[in-house]
């Protein structure tokens, strides 16, 4: 008789990082979690991945464009010699994803964001909203990752128009 085996759907995702950090992650099979109070921390504390390798390269370039202008790196080619892209296969389980492509999830996000703005008296970062959802409200038990479409290549302040979107994952 045939077993009703549910196969998991694994997909390759990409993470841009400094070469030494990447080597260490490959050796230990552990990627250090990103935790930051900076505005660039879009999706809260966690591990960041892109669906397309080119977006990981673009992230490296965009994040370090100012260093190129300051001559810390002679040019974008030199910059890419200091960084690497890691590929990671992750199981795709849509029921465990919190995403702005799901109308109910987006409404929850907007409601919590508005409440945090009301409580704090100023705009909040998207990462602050996700940290609140996952750490305070307990969404960590229900969801494994955030799949969020983010604008790329521009200095962004929230709220912003969602143009030039790229999907980014935070686990």
Say what each PLM segment does.
Residues 82-171:
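Active-site and NAD+-binding cores of ADP-ribose-processing enzymes
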Residues 1, 71, 148-149:
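Generic detector of solvent-exposed, compositionally biased contiguous segments
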Residues 13-21, 49-54, 89-94:
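Short, flexible loop/turn elements at secondary-structure junctions
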Residues 64-84:
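Cytochrome P450 catalytic domain signature, combining two hallmark sequence patches
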Residues 1-42:
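ADP-ribose/NAD+-binding catalytic cleft of ART/PARP-like enzymes
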Residues 11, 44-47, 83-87:
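Extracellular structured ligand-interaction cores
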Residues 36-66:
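Extended catalytic/binding region for NAD+/ADP-ribose chemistry, centered on the ART fold
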Residues 56-62, 69-70, 96-101:
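Short, solvent-exposed secondary-structure capping/transition elements
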């Amino acid at each position: 008789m045939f077993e009703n085996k549910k196969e998991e759907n694994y997909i390759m995702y990409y993470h841009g990082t400094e070469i030494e950090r990447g080597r260490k992650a490959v050796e230990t099979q552990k990627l250090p979690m990103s935790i930051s109070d900076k505005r660039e921390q879009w999706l809260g504390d966690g591990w960041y991945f892109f669906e397309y390798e080119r977006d990981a390269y673009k992230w490296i370039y965009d994040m370090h464009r100012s260093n190129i202008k300051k001559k810390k790196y002679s040019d974008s080619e030199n910059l890419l010699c200091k960084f690497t892209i890691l590929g990671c296969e992750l199981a795709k389980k849509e029921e465990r994803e919190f995403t702005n492509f799901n109308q109910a999830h987006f409404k929850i996000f907007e409601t919590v964001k508005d409440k945090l703005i009301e409580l704090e008296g100023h705009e909040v970062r998207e990462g602050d909203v996700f940290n609140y959802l996952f750490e305070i409200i307990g969404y960590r038990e229900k969801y494994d990752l955030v799949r969020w479409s983010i604008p790329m290549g521009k200095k962004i302040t929230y709220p912003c128009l969602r143009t030039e979107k790229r999907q980014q994952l935070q686990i």
